[in-house]
Amino acid sequence: MGLTQDFFPPTSELLEGGNQTSTFEFLLWGLSDQPQQQHIFFLLFLWMYVVTVAGNLLIVLAIGTDTHLHTPMYFFLASLSCADIFSTSTTVPKALVNIQTQSRSISYAGCLAQLYFFLTFGDMDIFLPATMAYDRYVAICHLLHYMMIMSLHRCAFLVTACWTLTSLLAMTRTFLIFRLSLCSKILPGFFCDLGPLMKVSCSDAQVNELVLLFLGGAVILIPFMLILVSYIRIVSAILRAPSAQGRRKAFSTCDSHLVVVALFFGTVIRAYLCPSSSSSNSVKEDTAAAVMYTVVTPLLNPFIYSMRNKDMKAAVVRLLKGRVSFSQGQ
């Protein structure tokens, strides 16, 4: 059954932009329209959420308690793990509550709040890999000046700038969504995101929609291009390295980051920059893509970054054994 009419039924109450009341509620489509699958999804997503939070928290604690990892690369990794925890916690707990209570509702104010925080933390998951790529570029292409360029002050500035910029961008896009008129209470997704809200908009505010599309494209493509340029230069520098051992060591510091970037940006570009229809199959594909970048990628990040990194694995083992290193050692 297509969703064009059944899934987006027009509501008798046109929701004019900026005039929505605090009593209005959206109905989320959820993870599946099959009731018999809800219990399976609840257990699966609960497991993934617990592992995601525990894994990323372990990364943060391991880096924070081991002075051997107090370097720019691990500072950015700890920041990314924090963003992953916050981003996942913005969407998954509400989805789990809705499954458990068999309720699909979310208040209008709650929807806007979820949208704002998801955009803020989600954009951090886009901006931080760009700073990490820049860090790897400096480490490999300008090794002699690395500590001078990537000073503690500059690292703190880059992360602070990312948080500030993502907050402002999220606030702008949330405000533009607030101004749109909505003609359906049913959102095609399991959380409040730009795509589902744009699909139920019936306003002709083309300027708002164009600004939203422009900002969304800029947030995704500019960091992606910076990452691409950084790694083109990194690969070029590595290939010019005189020794095979040096090339392998340089590649080993970048390959895990490339896996995360490819997985995350592939699904984000599919979700935000490739238009989709309101058909049943399209909604399911959009939901699957959303699961990938909101749940699966944050789940995999700790494993991808730690499995290929001996220092990270050693720090995690020391943390689990209670042997932390707060002082400069060895």
Curated annotation (Swiss-Prot):
Q: Which UniProt keywords apply?
A: Cell membrane, Disulfide bond, G-protein coupled receptor, Glycoprotein, Membrane, Olfaction, Receptor, Sensory transduction, Transducer, Transmembrane, Transmembrane helix
Q: Extracellular topology: which positions?
A: 1-39, 93-111, 159-209, 279-286
Which GO cellular component terms are attached? plasma membrane
Places the protein is found: Cell membrane
Which Pfam family, any one, appears in the UniProt record?
A: 7tm_4
Please give the biological process terms from Gene Ontology that the record holds.
signal transduction
Entry annotated with the keyword Lipid metabolism: no
Q: Which residues are glycosylated?
A: N19
Membership in a protein family: Belongs to the G-protein coupled receptor 1 family.
Role: Odorant receptor.
Task: Specify the protein name.
Answer: Olfactory receptor 1P1
Q: What is the lineage of its organism?
A: Eukaryota, Metazoa, Chordata, Craniata, Vertebrata
